[in-house]
């Protein structure tokens, strides 16, 4: 089963702290040969399948909030851990939910599960997030856009094609230009990494543009399928429910994809935060 990593989609959000990660309250008390962890983290992706989980925890109270945070690897089978599913608007089937809240109550974590040095978790998390945010987007976005083009060339029940709608195709063309520009940026960053440099603030740029383009593509997909996206009644298989989907697989999943991808501009640091990072580190504001 997968090891769940703090640098993945929704692991950076702690209960009641939202995107203000430095204010996290999940604590790890030093008990000699182990830490005693209490607190919660939320929007944890696939926690129900994980054997291990990486957590940022507060090991000391400091004047500067970013200090006193440490990086722990915690066994998900430990006593005191409870995983509660979060039902989301994309209406995934029972037992197939994506995100969870993980609660820690007096969870014992061996000292050897500390990653790096105590109190330097913030530094490690920022480094990992650079690579998560700078993840390559263009290849997948190209595929999604090509799928839209293909579907747009199919006649609807009235004999019309969206590929003949100038407004729809203009929206497609604008997104393709943006993806081309992003691919060029990704290739430049790969060159920098090969030269031994870090990703830097460009990762915030890629995360912002990549997720917003992805959201725009899901919006066009819903527009393309029209009323086939409305029923939104058959998200997947459930025990005892075998009603066939209405419309094609693409049409049947357009609305769930649209709702699910609303999260993309929030996870790994909201896009508003990414713009603040770019303003500070790139523009010096």
Where are these regions (language model features)?
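A short core secondary-structure module
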Residues: 38-84
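Hydrophobic, small-residue-rich alpha-helical packing segments that form membrane-like cores
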Residues: 18-20, 35
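A generic structural signal for well-ordered coil/turn residues at beta-strand boundaries
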Residues: 22-24, 49-51, 65-68, 77, ...
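Glycine-rich beta->alpha junctions and the first turn(s) of the following alpha-helix
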Residues: 83-182, 264, 280
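A structural signal for short hydrophobic beta-strand segments in well-ordered beta-sheet cores
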Residues: 26-29
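Glycine-rich phosphate/cofactor-binding loops in nucleotide/flavin-utilizing enzymes
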Residues: 119-135, 228-285
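Single conserved hydrophobic/aromatic residue that forms the stacking wall/gate
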Residues: 1-10, 14
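C-terminal helix-coil-helix/basic helical segment that borders enzyme active sites and/or dimer interfaces
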Residues: 158, 180-244
């Amino acid at each position: 089963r997968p090891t769940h990593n703090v640098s993945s989609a929704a692991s950076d959000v702690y209960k009641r702290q939202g995107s203000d990660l430095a204010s996290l309250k999940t604590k790890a008390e030093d008990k000699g040969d182990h830490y005693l962890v209490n607190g919660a983290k939320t929007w944890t992706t696939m926690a129900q399948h994980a054997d291990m989980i990486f957590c940022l925890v507060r090991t000391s109270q400091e004047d500067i909030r970013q200090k006193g945070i440490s990086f722990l690897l915690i066994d998900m089978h430990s006593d005191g851990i409870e995983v509660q599913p979060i039902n989301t608007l994309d209406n995934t089937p029972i037992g197939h939910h994506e995100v969870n809240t993980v609660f820690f109550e007096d969870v014992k974590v061996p000292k050897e599960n500390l990653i790096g040095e105590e109190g330097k978790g913030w530094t490690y998390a920022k480094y990992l997030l650079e690579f998560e945010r700078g993840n390559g987007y263009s290849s997948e976005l190209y595929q999604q856009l090509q799928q839209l083009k293909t579907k747009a060339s199919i006649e609807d029940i009235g004999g019309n094609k969206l590929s003949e709608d100038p407004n729809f195709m203009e929206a497609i063309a604008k997104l393709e230009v943006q993806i081309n520009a992003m691919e060029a940026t990704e290739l430049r960053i790969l060159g920098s990494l090969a030269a031994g440099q870090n990703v830097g603030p460009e990762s915030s740029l890629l995360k912002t543009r990549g997720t917003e383009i992805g959201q725009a593509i899901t919006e066009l997909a819903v527009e393309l399928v029209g009323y086939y996206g409305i029923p939104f009644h058959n998200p997947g298989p459930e025990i005892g429910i075998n009603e066939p989907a209405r419309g094609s697989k693409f049409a049947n999943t357009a609305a769930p994809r649209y709702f699910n991808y609303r999260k993309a501009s929030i996870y790994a640091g909201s896009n508003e935060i990414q713009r603040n990072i770019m303003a500070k580190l790139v523009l010096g504001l």
